[in-house]
Amino acid sequence: MTTTERPDLAWLDEVTMTQLERNPYEVYERLRAEAPLAFVPVLGSYVASTAEVCREVATSPDFEAVITPAGGRTFGHPAIIGVNGDIHADLRSMVEPALQPAEVDRWIDDLVRPIARRYLERFENDGHAELVAQYCEPVSVRSLGDLLGLQEVDSDKLREWFAKLNRSFTNAAVDENGEFANPEGFAEGDQAKAEIRAVVDPLIDKWIEHPDDSAISHWLHDGMPPGQTRDREYIYPTIYVYLLGAMQEPGHGMASTLVGLFSRPEQLEEVVDDPTLIPRAIAEGLRWTSPIWSATARISTKPVTIAGVDLPAGTPVMLSYGSANHDTGKYEAPSQYDLHRPPLPHLAFGAGNHACAGIYFANHVMRIALEELFEAIPNLERDTREGVEFWGWGFRGPTSLHVTWEV
């Protein structure tokens, strides 16, 4: 069956970016039921929405990575998430050594635990906090920022950068001609990149002459002939990828996990009483609200039929992993957070040879941060006077999380 035989999909013409940013689940629930692979006009792209189709496309030899148009406009080339072949192999060999489990285990506790404790000390005696801004995001960005070598950049600036890059990357709407519907929406991403370069260029100058153990210093030198370094223009797109995706994912993942646990008070109590359950709570939080919801894509390298749809060579497909993780064909009552759900694999970190390189690091940042939070404030409660609003289609998480506790 081809898309021309699906007149019932005319409703997709009315879907807007605002609708997807506010709540993509309604649209994607219908897509999963009616057309697991469908062309969505506002995105100018085919979209995969079920677990089966997302995994099939992500792992198929008939597809390779491609960056979305808005992502390419934001990051430039060669960004690690959108390249293939020798360039992808080189970039993965550049970033992966510092993220190997044996390497992460060597320093993760000493890196993250003092950061988490430092932020907790600022509010643990107040009896109230907004955890996204005061804890989850700062711990996430500070942990990665220090790993990269950006100790001189304060956490609020790192949060500002990833927010601006996020809005630029997800400025995905196109008009009937396939042109960006809101080209001015890339301006703040350009501003963030200019600020990033103003800070990082002098550091790169220093690291070229005086290498240290920071990640970006290793990116410059590792695997290169003596006396040579990778060109900064070659690594900047991947720096931007890290400053967006890798900066926000642990923060939004732990915030979503907390919101999920607050929806099941008895499960929150279990996790507080038994911290060994924290990794399981995080895995369910990532499935329940995937931080990287629909930000990656593939492109067909030959004519192929997927989910009954004939795709010519050169057809991009967006992979909506957040939708795949709500697939009723795989998960029972997927819109409900459930710590005791059978531990099935999820797609929050992607699949195939472009799966997230930082899975182990991100999981341990979240684990340590929640361990410290529950140890310091075991009687944490959501402040029900304040609502919880989730936002985002490419990247998704709670915009705020107000909590209270007795001091």
From Swiss-Prot:
Record bears the keyword Iron: yes
Any GO BP: catabolic process
Catalyses which reaction(s): guaiacol + reduced [NADH--hemoprotein reductase] + O2 = oxidized [NADH--hemoprotein reductase] + catechol + formaldehyde + H2O + H(+); 3-methoxycatechol + reduced [NADH--hemoprotein reductase] + O2 = 1,2,3-trihydroxybenzene + oxidized [NADH--hemoprotein reductase] + formaldehyde + H2O + H(+); anisole + reduced [NADH--hemoprotein reductase] + O2 = oxidized [NADH--hemoprotein reductase] + phenol + formaldehyde + H2O + H(+); guaethol + reduced [NADH--hemoprotein reductase] + O2 = oxidized [NADH--hemoprotein reductase] + catechol + acetaldehyde + H2O + H(+)
Binding site for heme: 88, 92, 298, 321, 351, 354, 356
Binding site for substrate: 241, 245
Known pathway: Aromatic compound metabolism
E.C. numbers: 1.14.14.-
Gene3D superfamilies assigned: Cytochrome P450 (1.10.630.10)
GO MF annotation list: heme binding; iron ion binding; monooxygenase activity; oxidoreductase activity, acting on paired donors, with incorporation or reduction of molecular oxygen
CC cofactor: heme b
One protein family per Pfam: p450
Keywords attached to this entry: Aromatic hydrocarbons catabolism, Heme, Iron, Metal-binding, Monooxygenase, Oxidoreductase
Domain of life according to the entry: Bacteria
Role noted for this protein: Part of a two-component P450 system that efficiently O-demethylates diverse aromatic substrates such as guaiacol and a wide variety of lignin-derived monomers. Is likely involved in lignin degradation, allowing Amycolatopsis sp. ATCC 39116 to catabolize plant biomass. GcoA binds and processes the substrate with electrons supplied by the GcoB subunit.
Subunit organization: Monomer. Forms a heterodimer with GcoB.
Family: Belongs to the cytochrome P450 family.
This protein's name: Aromatic O-demethylase, cytochrome P450 subunit
Lineage, highest ranks first: Bacteria, Bacillati, Actinomycetota, Actinomycetes, Pseudonocardiales
Gene this protein is translated from: gcoA
